[in-house]
């Protein structure tokens, strides 16, 4: 006894389509998470902290956290906009 459909294939859940804007934002923030903390580390190591690796690492951690907060803010704004839907247009005579 298995959960097979009469065609012999396993039943699948309906697939939701991924919106291009969501995928674009995910790729953008993934690239930012890869580039910005490393760039922040090396730039602050040489120009701001004069070779102090501890403070440069703290700066990189702060940069990564700012990117994460930015992603969460963008996600919440997008979710709130999708819940309310488009505003109805007012007709002027």
Curated annotation (Swiss-Prot):
It is a multi-pass membrane protein. Keywords: Cytoplasmic vesicle, Endoplasmic reticulum, Membrane, Transmembrane, Transmembrane helix. It is found in: Endoplasmic reticulum membrane; Endoplasmic reticulum-Golgi intermediate compartment membrane; Cytoplasmic vesicle, COPII-coated vesicle membrane. The chain crosses the membrane at residues 22-42, 55-75. One of its GO terms (biological process) is vacuolar proton-transporting V-type ATPase complex assembly. It comes from the Eukaryota. Residues 1-21, 76-93 are cytoplasmic. Residues 43-54 are lumenal. HAMAP family: VMA21. PANTHER family: VACUOLAR ATPASE ASSEMBLY INTEGRAL MEMBRANE PROTEIN VMA21. Belongs to the VMA21 family. This is Vacuolar ATPase assembly integral membrane protein VMA21.
């Amino acid at each position: 006894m298995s959960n097979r459909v009469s065609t012999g294939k396993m039943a699948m859940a309906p697939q939701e389509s991924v919106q291009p804007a969501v995928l674009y934002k995910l790729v953008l923030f993934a690239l930012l998470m890869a580039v910005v903390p490393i760039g922040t580390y090396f730039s602050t190591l040489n120009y701001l902290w004069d070779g102090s690796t501890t403070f440069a690492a703290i700066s990189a951690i702060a940069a990564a956290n700012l990117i994460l907060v930015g992603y969460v803010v963008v996600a919440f704004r997008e979710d709130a906009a999708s819940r309310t839907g488009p505003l109805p247009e007012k007709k002027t005579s």
